[in-house]
Amino acid sequence: MFSNLDLAVAFIYVCLGLIGFGVLILLMMKARSIILERKRAALLEKHQPYFVYLQRHIVDPDPFQPPKGPLSPLETRVIQDKLMEWIEKFRGAQRQKLTALCEDMDLVQLDRKQLSSMFYAKQMKAAYRLGGMRSAQAVEPLIELMKQEKDGPLLHVLARSVAKCAEHLDQLYVMLQQLTRHRKGNYLNAAEVLEETSLDVTPLLLQCMEDRDHNLVKTALLALRGQTGVTLTPALLRLADSDDKEIRSLAVKMLVRAGNILPEETICSWLTDPEGEIRAAVAESLGQFGYEGSIPALKQALTDSDWWVRYHSAKSLAMMGDAGFRTLCEAALERDDPFKSDMAKDRIHEELLREHFFANRRKQISGAHTKQSLYEQYFGQASSVPNIRGIGGDYSA
């Protein structure tokens, strides 16, 4: 019979054997990786004259000639990787020439076949490479695979590749539909994916803003965040009354950003929206774009029941120069609402600390009223900035 000690020794030997086997596998993988990198470096050196030829003739109108002679699978991938690297760097006719070379070398066709592989990893790599080559020939098979695929990493790689390869807005529209149909949060990724395309997507985004699919509407609003044109105002005003609070929030933010088109009364009226998230977004946007006419509305918002609305209102007031800071001081002294007073004091404290930190810079601005001097007008002489912690703060949620 085996004793407990024998069993323990046997167990230790088994563990050591497994550890040794695992270390051996890791060493083999590392060695294989080193060998592969050396082979790739050697092949890059071998085909350097061809790469020089491509660089010298990149601006010529004539198409590139494919490499002469048969290529091994590894040689094909090495050249393909170099071409994909250049495709990302170039634009216009130069990019089109490099993409045409990929098609002439049957690289696009090779990866199109890999899309139907039974192995997930091969599909992923093929989708990535097709996007890197930006060939219009890859759009249809990529979209077909998107229609079959469930939500996951491959779906997002396929969507990004479609965006890179698409030649028509209809193709991008189908891609957006397939990307956002699985999960509500995918509209965030969809808006980011659209940045990969070389097409002008503004007409597509305007179309999506009228769509019944809320995810497509959100995608369009996120993708249009940097635009404040007058042409968007009618659609945004309609979406500002949407039942979906996320759509309403995004639309209101964009309208506030384009505040020169709308009366300030309209903007400030959104501070009474039933959704606290939207009221907070409006309060935040008012400060970012410096609408001093909204100071009374922001002061009133300091009494809001939502902590984030009070926080962004106080922060926005602090961003509106002397007038905003005076309003904060007045709110801090008023006793009608403790939440308003505490939030105002908390923001005053942060602003004074910030001014103290940048004191040397502020001294260079001649004639400017510092927030410290305004503070002293309302609260008297402060002994030192670090001791201002005693003025309190709003910590209610």
Feature map (PLM): residue ranges:
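Eukaryotic acidic, Ser/Thr-rich intrinsically disordered low-complexity regions
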Residues: 333-397
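N-terminal signal-anchor transmembrane alpha helix of single-pass membrane proteins
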Residues: 1-41
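Amphipathic alpha-helical scaffolding segments comprising HEAT/armadillo-like alpha-solenoid repeats
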Residues: 99-115, 135-147, 167-179, 199-210, ...
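Structural detector for internal amphipathic alpha-helices that build alpha-solenoid repeat scaffolds
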Residues: 85, 92-102, 124-134, 155-167, ...
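N-terminal topogenic membrane-targeting module
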Residues: 31-116
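HEAT/HEAT-like alpha-solenoid repeats
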Residues: 138-139, 143-146, 182, 246, ...
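Long, contiguous interaction/recruitment modules in multidomain scaffold/adaptor proteins
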Residues: 24-39, 143, 147-198, 203, ...
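Short inter-helical turns and helix N-cap capping residues of alpha-solenoid HEAT/ARM repeat scaffolds
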Residues: 118-119, 149-154, 182-184, 212-214, ...
